[in-house]
């Protein structure tokens, strides 16, 4: 399982890096433009992916590691509201999160261990591996939304191919 999760985490890092290269070419107004998606804009969707990675993987799941990683900077940024950061700061946080997620996969001793994960109104009892797969795939889903927005804006993009790693 570790090999699969490491591959997926490295893929997310690769895809995020390539997505950021495209997003850095856009005007800030294009990043913030309301395009009618659930999280309103490219930047809103980008922030949502980062929030989930920090809160769930680097927050809750990290607490299940034998030696939890130091994610204080990311947790502090999340607590103060990622939307309050400029784009350059968000890029730094994204890159830091991607590195730590790979380190977290390496630090987990037992991916089959079942843990409860609760949110207001719902809770799950799943293996740590399933939580990892769910959140890593969550990023893929929302990067696909960003790619579709870029397509509609006629901005060339191709940051999602795992075989290109």
Where is each model-derived feature located?
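Acidic/histidine-rich alpha-helical segments that form the ligand environment
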Residues: 78-118, 126-142
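Basic/polar N-terminal segments that are highly enriched at the extreme N-terminus
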Residues: 1-3
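Short, contiguous alpha-helical
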Residues: 6-21, 25-76, 119-165
């Amino acid at each position: 399982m570790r090999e699969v999760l490491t591959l997926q985490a490295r893929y997310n890092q690769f895809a995020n890096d390539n997505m950021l290269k495209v997003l850095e070419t856009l005007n800030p107004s294009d990043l913030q433009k309301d395009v009618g998606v659930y999280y309103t804009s490219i930047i809103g969707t980008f922030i949502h992916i980062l929030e989930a990675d920090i809160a769930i993987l680097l927050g809750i799941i990290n607490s299940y590691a034998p030696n939890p990683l130091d994610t204080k900077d990311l947790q502090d940024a999340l607590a103060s509201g990622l939307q309050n950061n400029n784009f350059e700061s968000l890029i730094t946080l994204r890159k830091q999160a991607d590195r730590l997620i790979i380190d977290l996969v390496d630090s987990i001793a037992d991916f089959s261990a079942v843990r409860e994960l609760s949110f207001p109104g719902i809770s799950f009892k799943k293996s740590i591996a399933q939580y990892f797969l769910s959140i890593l795939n969550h990023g893929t889903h929302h990067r696909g939304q960003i790619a579709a927005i870029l397509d509609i804006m006629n901005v060339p993009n191709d940051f999602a191919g795992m075989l290109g790693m």
